[in-house]
C-alpha cells in the first residue's frame, strides 16, 4: 500500500442519501495506467473519448477513468514543461563550450508583446530577469570586476559612463 496513490473511502454510519449507490470495487495498476494513456494520447479531440467504453474496457467506474485521464494529462504536461525549461536553461548557460563538430545553436525565435522576433539569447534573458536582479547579473557576467555601483542603481547606465561622470565631477 502506497500513501501517494491510495485512496481510502470511509463509510460513516448515518442517514444514507436517497439514490446513493456504493461504487463497485475495482483494482487499478500501472499496466492499466499505461494502457489508458496509450489509448487517450492518440485521440485528437476530447469529444471523441467514449468514457463508457473506457470504463467497460478497464472494469473501473467512469468517474475514476475521467479523473485518472485528467491526472495523466497533468503529469505528462508537467514533464513536457520541465523538459522545455531544462532545454531553455541549458541554452542560457554562459559557460557552455562548443566543440568543433557542434552545429551552431538555433535562434530562440520568441515573439515579444509587440509581435517582434527576439532572436538573441541575451535579449531573451534580459526579459526573463527581473529588473531588480539585472545589476547583479551584469556583475556576474564581468567576473566580479564591476565597481558595485550597478548593483545600487536601477538605471541602465554603463560602467564607463559612470566613470566619466565621476572623473568630470572630480575634475580630473
Curated annotation (Swiss-Prot):
Stretch list, region Disordered: 87-158
Ranges of biased composition (kind: Low complexity): 147-158
Cited InterPro entries: ATG29, Atg29_N, ATG29_sf
Keywords in alphabetical order: Autophagy, Protein transport, Transport
GO molecular function, one term: SNARE binding
UniProt superkingdom: Eukaryota
Gene3D superfamilies noted in UniProt: 1.10.10.2570
Predominant localisation class: other
Cellular compartments annotated: Preautophagosomal structure
Compositionally biased spans, kind Polar residues: 114-131
Database matches in Pfam families: ATG29_N
GO CC term, one of those recorded: phagophore assembly site
GO biological process: autophagy of mitochondrion; cellular response to nitrogen starvation; piecemeal microautophagy of the nucleus; protein localization to phagophore assembly site; protein transport
Role summary: Plays a role in autophagy. Functions at the preautophagosomal structure (PAS) in order to form normal autophagosomes under starvation conditions. Also plays a role in mitophagy and regulation of filamentous growth.
Family: Belongs to the ATG29 family.
UniProt protein name: Autophagy-related protein 29
Annotated organism of origin: Eremothecium gossypii (strain ATCC 10895 / CBS 109.51 / FGSC 9923 / NRRL Y-1056) (Yeast)
Amino acid at each position: 500500500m502506497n500513501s501517494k496513490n491510495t485512496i481510502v473511502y470511509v463509510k460513516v454510519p448515518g442517514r444514507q442519501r436517497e439514490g446513493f449507490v456504493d461504487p463497485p470495487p475495482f483494482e487499478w495498476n500501472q499496466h492499466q495506467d499505461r494502457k489508458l494513456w496509450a489509448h487517450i494520447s492518440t485521440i485528437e479531440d476530447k469529444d471523441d473519448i467514449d468514457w463508457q467504453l473506457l470504463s467497460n474496457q478497464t472494469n473501473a467506474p467512469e468517474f475514476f477513468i475521467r479523473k485518472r485521464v485528467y491526472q495523466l494529462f497533468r503529469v505528462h504536461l508537467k514533464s513536457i514543461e520541465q523538459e522545455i525549461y531544462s532545454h531553455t536553461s541549458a541554452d542560457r548557460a554562459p559557460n557552455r563550450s562548443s566543440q568543433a563538430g557542434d552545429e551552431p545553436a538555433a535562434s530562440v525565435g520568441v515573439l515579444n508583446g509587440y509581435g517582434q522576433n527576439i532572436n538573441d539569447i541575451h535579449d531573451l534573458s534580459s526579459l526573463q530577469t527581473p529588473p531588480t536582479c539585472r545589476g547583479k547579473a551584469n556583475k556576474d557576467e564581468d567576473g566580479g570586476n564591476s565597481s558595485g555601483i550597478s548593483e545600487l542603481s536601477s538605471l541602465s547606465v554603463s560602467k564607463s559612463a559612470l566613470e566619466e561622470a565621476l572623473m568630470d565631477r572630480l575634475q580630473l
